[in-house]
Amino acid sequence: MVSHPFHDETVDWMGHRAFLPLPCLARTVPSQTWLEARILEGCTPIFNQDKEEQKMAEIAVEATEVPAQLPHLRVAVLGAGKMGGILLQAFLKQNLFAPEQIHATVGHAERAIALSTQWGVDVSTDNLRAAKHADLILLGVKPFQVPDLIAEIKPALTTKKTLISFAASVKTRAIEDAAGMEIAVIRAMPNTPSALGAGAAGLCKGRFVSAKQMELAQRIFETVGRTVVVDEKHMDAVTGLSASGPAYIYIIIEALAEAGVKVGLPRDTATQLAAQTTFGAAKMVLETGYHPALLKDAVTTPAGCTIDGILELEEGGLRVTLIKAVMRATQRAKELAAG
């Protein structure tokens, strides 16, 4: 069905709304999926579900063949949805934990069966049972669900367990108070590139966290990317910058690709160049340690092409717009924390 003059709206395999530029639409029956349409028209699919499921099955097999790095810990992932699932898969891929060390939970029995088969770990709908047998409990539910989850698993909590929450804007003190004991609570804010081991995560500790527990949390999140430890007062800023940040960068990549199309490049070529350029620039910053301004100046020759492009960016307000985006997202995180 066409609901926009320039896009076809459909639903992808995850149930998300997807908009497909008309040049990539298949010219056959309306019942074709978004992915099928792209394949039939010669466009490269963004995601292949079958290959991803096969990959996870292979990871599960590999995890049983290589000794786990932390074999002494039992782990519960309560709410193995988007981010919880990303972390769980990273644990297996990096052999941080063996499948038999992990018990994940989801909201529906049918999904539990499917994910147990896919991941090779114990998956159920029983949060209390998972928490009871775990040393390390990851809280992967949405912020508004945290109080009910803590109440549900409270009979299984002891001061020897460690809780790691990545529910946005939920403070460590709130979880400590809900637990009703001096339990270690660590707050984490990862982002979606963690799925490829290229994430960025901010961590902060509650009042009862030992140095050893914090080191464990850092080790866990370093399996999915870079990790920084901050004071809790800065966690909303982490949310506004790195947790929301991938969306900002996707817009930049999309805009660069559109620009490439505008000046004559095929769309797939333009997208690859835009994405790789963004990746390469980020890698230069991280691996050289140079300030971005110095790296920018190294590309900008007198009276050259780049300085003209930069002039357009500055006149268009890109720098200020990005700053305002992070400020607004940070403010929204604070609003959510305040209820």
Predicted segments, located by residue:
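Intrinsic disorder/low-complexity segments
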Residues: 1-56
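NAD(P)+-binding Rossmann beta1-loop-alpha1 motif at the extreme N-terminus of oxidoreductases
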Residues: 47, 52-125, 129-133, 198-199, ...
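NAD(P)-dependent Rossmann-like dehydrogenase/reductase catalytic/cofactor-binding core
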Residues: 57-69, 275-339
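Internal alpha-helical scaffold of NAD(P)-dependent oxidoreductase catalytic cores
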Residues: 59, 174-184, 200-238, 250-287, ...
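Short pre-catalytic strand/loop immediately N-terminal to key active-site residues, enriched for Gly-Thr
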Residues: 73, 235-240, 292-297
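Rossmann-like NAD(P)(H) cofactor-binding subdomain of soluble oxidoreductases
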Residues: 87, 103, 108-110, 119, ...
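Small-residue helix-packing motif on alpha-helices
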Residues: 102, 112, 130, 266-273, ...
